[in-house]
Amino acid sequence: MPHSDELDSRDVLSVSGLNIAFHHEGQQVDAVRNVSLRLKRGETLTIVGESGSGKSVTALALMRLIEQSGANVRCGEMLLRRRNRQVIELSEQSDAQMRRVRGADIAMIFQEPMTSLNPVFTVGEQIAESIRLHQGASHEEALAEAKRMLDQVRIPESQAILSRYPHQLSGGMRQRVMIAMALSCRPAVLIADEPTTALDVTIQAQILQLIKVLQQEMSMGVIFITHDMGVVADIADRVLVMYQGEAVETGSVEQIFHAPTHPYTQTLLAAVPQLGAMRGHSLPRRFPLISADEPALYESQIEQDTVVEGEPILQVRGLVTRFPLRSGLFNRVTREVHAVENISFDLWPGETLSLVGESGSGKSTTGRALLRLVESRQGEIIFNGQRIDTLSAGKLQPLRRDIQCIFQDPYASLDPRQTVGYSIMEPLRIHGLGQGDAAAKRVAWLLERVGLRPEHAWRYPHEFSGGQRQRICIARALALNPKVIIADEAVSALDVSVRGQIINLLLDLQREMGIAYLFISHDMAVVERISHRVAVMYLGQIVEMGPRRAVFENPQHPYTRKLMAAVPVADPSRHRPRRVLLSDDIPSNIHKRGEETPAVSLQLVGPGHYVARPLQDNALSRL
């Protein structure tokens, strides 16, 4: 049915009176109520709001994927102008018609790449499939275009990445693959649902720049869903603010940032962490407290002086972790990924040490090596005076209750067949620390501590938003009262208000229980707030390490300074010229078998502040 007379000539998408409902155990739950929006060619509309506000549900409705989640569009109109200028009503299209529309005319980058990529196909085959389907290219042409797209999203060793599987890539790498796949067919409308959540600030800056360039080339309309107000200020033309399933405010990016009218918008902006807010303070501090009824903020003056002097709870000495890459007729190991190269550090009780760096720098691998989820090539890991890198699985089991983890991808961490209450209770049952009513009460308490309701224990992971799933993972990590928590991007999927609540919770638990955190993150504003010390990683090596104040206020290494310069500012009037932050020749940590990485030498430049000495033949010297 033609609808061209109902869509403005400049619009590529129009949504009017959209209402979406979920059906659960015979009950109807309204997730989105009366949402309307318009998107013009070449325009970027950002949708912001708390986790569970209906942002992602709205996007899934536009892709006609909402039915797979047990929801339906109750009423409303969704008009799309295809690349051939034909205007269609999305809700009237059959499944076969939508398969032709998705990817070619409207594409989506999802928040959790591991659940969006097929684990049994290589990266190259998955990107090439979309190109073959919508562009009619041959297999060879599609693979060549897939490599070009990987180059565009700045994945090093793109030819090698084509033959690798999703589980062999870091979270940030997987997200870049998703972005390459979505942009490969140059759609008329791109929906990006938290596309840079898993990316470090430098790659985030490059990806945002790439989307802008492609948007201008193709006059592509972009709907950008995010909780990062710095990103909103950087890329948005207009902003739609959602709260509890409704659009509460819309306007230009300047109007929203400089003259917000709705109390929720004012509260949302006030809660944004600002890089530099900790200048002059040496110890971690809680985020400002937000009242739901009063946008004014109250900043706690309590500093987190929790570090216990004496012996470190965790010691790492000369850790090396490498992964083999096989190729050739006989599938022999010909190259290796030098993921972690000769790193050493200590972690004291009650301390937060943050690992920062780009995707693929070795941060997550370091955390997994400490948990013995991957085996290290060499080095020592000493926990509470006991060497654990040589322990058998049986002897390691009792120690696991003292070292817990929060992973980057919450959906992959939760069993989809079990209720979240069962998943939280499982560590208690395994370690014999509770069962029956006592365990149920513990689960209810943990859910409340992370901002969820006790009755959520009976729901399944797919019934929660990405941010809510991450809170469930945090509750599970806290169940055993651990001495050390390794948090791998633990708050990256959370909106700003919930992020502040979770960081405050982690700080409270650290003060009450003396927990030590190894905090892996690319969010420099959060790292600045929570850290006692910071270690900067690049290509598997630590290039700068020291007290948080010294590293942030006086960064010595060129790479550290580039990380700081890439952080987006949550103010559209303060755009900083952000050039491409890394050279076009991206160094790679993939080496021939037997080839050794030159070790960096750390120099003491201040109290506890160490910086890598550049080497002539080292990638660090080319930064």
Swiss-Prot record:
It is found in: Cell inner membrane. It holds the Pfam family ABC_tran. InterPro entries: AAA+_ATPase, ABC_transp_ATP-bind, ABC_transporter-like_ATP-bd, ABC_transporter-like_CS, Oligopep_ABC_C, P-loop_NTPase. Transmembrane segments: none annotated. One of its GO terms (biological process) is peptide transport. Residues 15-269, 325-564 form the ABC transporter domain. GO terms for molecular function: ATP binding; ATP hydrolysis activity. ATP binds at residues 49-56, 357-364. Keywords: ATP-binding, Cell inner membrane, Cell membrane, Hydrolase, Membrane, Nucleotide-binding, Repeat, Translocase, Transport. It comes from the Bacteria. Disulfide bonds: none annotated. It catalyses: glutathione(out) + ATP + H2O = glutathione(in) + ADP + phosphate + H(+). It is a peripheral membrane protein. One of its GO terms (cellular component) is plasma membrane. Its EC number is 7.4.2.10. Part of the ABC transporter complex GsiABCD involved in glutathione import. Responsible for energy coupling to the transport system. NCBIfam families: PRK10261.1 (NF007613), PRK10419.1 (NF007739), PRK11308.1 (NF008453). PANTHER family: GLUTATHIONE IMPORT ATP-BINDING PROTEIN GSIA, TRANSPORT ATP-BINDING PROTEIN. Belongs to the ABC transporter superfamily. Glutathione importer (TC 3.A.1.5.11) family. The complex is composed of two ATP-binding proteins (GsiA), two transmembrane proteins (GsiC and GsiD) and a solute-binding protein (GsiB). This is Glutathione import ATP-binding protein GsiA.
